[in-house]
Amino acid sequence: MSCIKNSFEALKAKNEKALVGFVTAGDPDFGKSVEIVKAMCEGGMDVLELGIPFSDPTADGPVIQRSSQRALSSGMSLPKVLEMVKIVRGFTKIPIVLFGYYNPIFSYGGKRFYEDALAAGADGVLIVDLPPEESAELTSLWEGDDFDFIRLVAPTTGQDRMKQIAGEASGFIYLVSMTGVTGSQGLDSSKVADVNAPLKAVTDLPVCVGFGISTPEHVKAVAAVSDGVVVGSAFERLIEENLENRGLHTMVQEYTESLKAATRG
């Protein structure tokens, strides 16, 4: 059984929903990024999404685009992301999901990526721009059930397409709360419930909702209609606004604690 599946089952037993946190690996630099992740873990994060910096992150809003630029400017690369995973795995047991675009993974080599990510301590991957019909060649290189492939479902996805995506997914499904790019505003939890219901009809996998979630109130509302909540741009905004602030570690930890408290039933 995968680490991700174990984690969701343990949370369900405690009547809690998962808090999934995203940060770009290497933002603003390698050392500070490790400390930021440590603060998230100390704050009670359940699942960590580590973004692989990319020069053309088209699905992301300006906040995460700038985080990618800062990470790349500091010398971050996919091999260094995997090095960071090893370090993070040394101080936490929570699932680590690598989050990014296909180009860096393709350049690195699919089989090599799987083997090195697994060896580093990663538990899965979410590739934003790789739909199921284009991913068979990559996933055929992977063996066993210890490395999950998380899939995205949009609010505009039809029932048949949902079923296809869910059939190709493992770990959990990332349900996008609204159309647009990461960091978009205008969250409506009732619309999330409307999309989640048909999705849950075709899969037993946990469904985690992201895009536009930044406050404990958002988390509480979305957690009531899903299995987990993804917060990304809000973490990156906090980092961006406090790049030179020595209290950033404490700020990230306390922010994480406030979000996590809202996931408890």
Swiss-Prot record:
Its recorded reaction(s) are:
(1S,2R)-1-C-(indol-3-yl)glycerol 3-phosphate + L-serine = D-glyceraldehyde 3-phosphate + L-tryptophan + H2O
Q: Which Pfam families match?
A: Trp_syntA (PF00290)
Q: Which GO terms describe its cellular component?
A: cytosol
Report the coiled-coil segments.
Answer: none
What this chain does, per the entry, is described as: The alpha subunit is responsible for the aldol cleavage of indoleglycerol phosphate to indole and glyceraldehyde 3-phosphate.
Q: Which domain of life is it from?
A: Bacteria
Q: Which HAMAP family match?
A: Trp_synth_alpha
**Active site per UniProt:** 49 (proton acceptor), 60 (proton acceptor)
One GO term in the molecular function aspect is: tryptophan synthase activity
Which keywords does UniProt give here? Amino-acid biosynthesis, Aromatic amino acid biosynthesis, Lyase, Tryptophan biosynthesis
Query: What is the scientific name of the source organism?
Result: Desulfatibacillum aliphaticivorans
- Pathway annotation: Amino-acid biosynthesis; L-tryptophan biosynthesis; L-tryptophan from chorismate: step 5/5
Disulphide bonds in the chain? none
Keyword DNA repair among UniProt keywords: no
PANTHER family to which the protein is assigned, alphabetical: TRYPTOPHAN SYNTHASE ALPHA CHAIN, CHLOROPLASTIC, TRYPTOPHAN SYNTHASE, ALPHA CHAIN
Q: How does it assemble?
A: Tetramer of two alpha and two beta chains.
> Which family is it part of?
Belongs to the TrpA family.
Full protein name: Tryptophan synthase alpha chain
Which InterPro entries does the entry link to?
Aldolase_TIM (IPR013785), RibuloseP-bd_barrel (IPR011060), Trp_synthase_suA (IPR002028)
Its EC number is 4.2.1.20
